[in-house]
From Swiss-Prot:
In the central section; belongs to the AAA ATPase family. In the C-terminal section; belongs to the peptidase M41 family. Residues 1-7, 131-637 are cytoplasmic. The gene is ftsH. Induction: Induced by osmotic shock (0.8 M NaCl) and by heat shock (52 degrees Celsius). Keywords: ATP-binding, Cell cycle, Cell division, Cell membrane, Hydrolase, Membrane, Metal-binding, Metalloprotease, Nucleotide-binding, Protease, Stress response, Transmembrane, Transmembrane helix, Zinc. The active site is at E424. Its cofactor is Zn(2+). ATP binds at G201, P202, P203, G204, T205, G206, K207, T208. It comes from Bacillus subtilis (strain 168). Its main location: membrane. This is ATP-dependent zinc metalloprotease FtsH. It is found in: Cell membrane; Membrane raft. Changing K207N: Does not complement an ftsH deletion, loss of ATPase activity.
Length: 637
């Protein structure tokens, strides 16, 4: 926006200057009429001449004057040759009362400027237009210059205190900070500080924030660049930018260089369909040389971030280059609470907001997810003109982050509403009965995003690995919705397609990756689906098992799904009263949280408090007998 404004102002100034110069010349040059010598003599004899000025110009006399009937800005101009003609005019002027005014001498500078100014204006305008066409300045010559941004200001530096939920990761980077502050301490002991630190982890876990905090704590210049900024369409530009980056870093040493998304330039050489990318490989080669080549780069530490460390070139990860890898994972419940406290500093929270409870309800959330959750809560509160963010705003924000905004205006038929209620009720009952299944933290039949309703099924605690019974119970929980539809309505709908997708994926990984098939044994088959595929490397990978094994894999997956389906059917049949109670309550209040579900199962009623903005507790009390009878009436209709 600023650049557009500056360009507009520049063009306006150029236009005003041109208009001013043209106006000046037009106003400074009065109307002049060329008059012949004979006519001038006749007018002079007739007494029509009022005033004249005579000025010698290049061998003639330039006579400029006004007739008595002329306007104020009207003049005549005639030229008189030297000699008798001039003497005749001078003698005639002496005999008349014509005013002879001294000639106005024009300064040489004025003449020069009036001649040169139009050319200067044209040149400046042409130069500016050429500048714009080239993208500014000597852009063609600057292709090889680094695009890294240098941060040296002391204000608004990120510190380690601004990074929460990554205590171990921060500790790993403390050595880097100490080296930048006091390198002699390490040199005296013969220690070599890591030249490169690679931050690996899922998106949104704070890799870039950790790098900024490292530079902020050390108080040194901080160069920031993205991996995609190196490679351009022109050959050799990437390598040139790498050289220029390290040249600038040497001038500002000690310093930090942060390369975000380094996999854009550091992926394996020679990989890719149709061969490698020569320009990218040339850039990578130059980066390898600069990091650990013949010329030492003392005082320069490189921090890079990626979420695809599996595709990086091995030469980039060897000791002497990125010889320290720090895994920045999603925070656990304690880390999530710490992250929430950091992002809640500038937000007024109501006393009903419990950050620890929010942390327990958000397993798997990254730091960016938690920041977005609190920001959404602030937006929800502001939309309702509240002064503080309360627990309801947090709940609404959590739902928006997980499933999208509520579609309260969507028109849903009574039949579809019943199907959704019993579908979500099936998930809920399975979560209540099975100890190893994911627990339902919230269930609703309010449409959100693409879903007609949803149940928030989360692990009971943070898990870093899962047992076979846990995985089987998870599949049973996913199938609970479809089974409930079949038991209650005797028919099934398309609402369970996502449940089937997730359940099938778990069963397939149990058989092909985790070795949990009794028939096939502890073997792994094919490409691990837990890791991401790199097409250039994995395209030509052949199937490492026979067609017979492939058939047996399919049979094992079907067996697991069928057994879990039958198990879910048995559980819901035995607990049909709970299914009816939860489904009918959902049809009345639309949304239930974990506390309400527990109280409903234990006492047959909802707890004595408001559950929605529209309904009071007295209006939503239900019991098993009443709701079962209502269901029978509905099915008769």
């Amino acid at each position: 926006m600023n650049r557009v404004f500056r360009n507009t102002i520049f063009y306006l100034l150029i236009l005003l200057v041109v208009i001013g110069v043209v106006s000046y010349f037009q106003t400074s040059n009065p109307k002049t009429e060329n008059m012949s010598y004979s006519t001038f003599i006749k007018n002079l004899d007739d007494g029509k001449v009022d005033s004249v000025s005579v000025q010698p110009v290049r061998g003639v006399y330039e006579v400029k004057g006004q007739l008595k009937n002329y306007d104020k800005d009207q003049y005549f101009l005639t030229h008189v040759p030297e000699g008798k003609g001039a003497d005749q005019i001078f003698n005639a002027l002496k005999k008349t009362d014509v005013k002879v005014e001294p000639a106005q001498e024009t300064s040489g500078w004025v003449t020069f400027l009036t001649t040169i100014i139009p050319f200067v204006i044209i040149f400046i305008l042409f130069f500016f237009l050429l500048n714009q066409a080239q993208g500014g300045g000597s852009r063609v010559m600057n292709f090889g210059k680094s695009k890294a941004k240098l941060y040296t200001e002391e204000k608004k530096r990120v510190k380690f205190k601004d990074v929460a939920g990554a205590d171990e990761e921060k500790q790993e980077l403390v050595e880097v900070v100490e080296f930048l502050k006091d390198p002699r301490k390490f040199a005296e002991l013969g220690a070599r500080i890591p030249k490169g630190v690679l931050l690996v982890g899922p998106p949104g876990t704070g890799k870039t924030l950790l790098a900024k905090a490292c530079a902020g704590e050390a108080g040194v210049p901080f160069f920031s660049i993205s991996g995609s900024d190196f490679v351009e369409m022109f050959v050799g530009v990437g390598a040139s930018r790498v050289r220029d980056l390290f040249e600038n870093a040497k001038k500002n040493a000690p310093c930090l260089i942060f390369i975000d998304e380094i996999d854009a330039v550091g992926r394996q050489r020679g990989a890719g369909l149709g061969g490698g990318h020569d320009e990218r490989e040339q850039t990578l080669n130059q980066l390898l040389v600069e990091m650990d080549g013949f010329s030492a780069n003392e005082g320069i530490i490189i921090i890079a971030a990626t979420n695809r460390a599996d595709i990086l070139d091995p030469a980039l990860l060897r000791p002497g280059r990125f010889d320290r890898q720090i895994t920045v994972d999603r925070p656990d419940v304690i880390g999530r609470e710490a992250v929430l406290k950091v992002h809640a500093r500038n937000k007024p929270l109501d006393e009903t907001v419990n950050l620890k409870s929010i942390a327990m309800r958000t397993p798997g959330f990254s730091g960016a997810d938690l920041e977005n959750l609190l920001n959404e809560a602030a937006l929800v509160a502001a939309r309702q003109n509240k002064k503080k963010i309360d627990a309801r705003d947090i709940d609404e924000a959590t739902d928006r982050v997980i499933a999208g905004p509520a579609k309260k205006s969507r028109v849903i038929s009574k039949k579809e509403r019943n199907i959704v209620a019993y579908h979500e009720g099936g998930h809920t009952v399975i979560g209540l009965v099975l100890d190893e299944a994911d627990m339902v933290h919230k269930v609703t039949i309010v449409p959100r995003g693409q879903a007609g309703g949803y149940a928030v099924m989360l692990p009971r605690e943070d898990r870093y690995f899962q047992t076979k019974p846990e995985l089987l119970d998870k599949i049973v929980g996913l199938l609970g919705g479809r089974v409930a539809e079949e038991i209650i309505f005797g028919e099934v709908s398309t609402g369970a397609h996502n449940d089937f997708q997730r359940a099938t994926n778990i069963a397939r990984r149990m058989v092909t990756e985790f070795g949990m098939s009794e028939k096939l044994g502890p073997l792994q088959f094919g490409q691990s689906q837990g890791g991401q595929v790199f097409l250039g490397r994995d395209f030509n990978n052949e199937q490492n098992y026979s067609d017979q094994i492939a058939y047996e894999i399919d049979q094992e997956i079907q067996r697991i799904i069928k057994e879990c389906y039958e198990r879910a059917k048995q559980i819901l049949t035995e607990n049909r009263d709970k299914l009816e109670l939860i489904a009918q309550t959902l049809l009345k209040v639309e949304t239930l949280d974990a506390e309400q579900i527990k109280h409903l199962i234990d006492h047959g009623t909802l707890p004595e408090r408001n559950f929605s903005d529209d309904e009071k507790n007295d209006d939503v009390k239900v019991n098993i007998l009443t709701k079962t009878e209502e269901k029978k009436d509905d099915t008769k209709e």
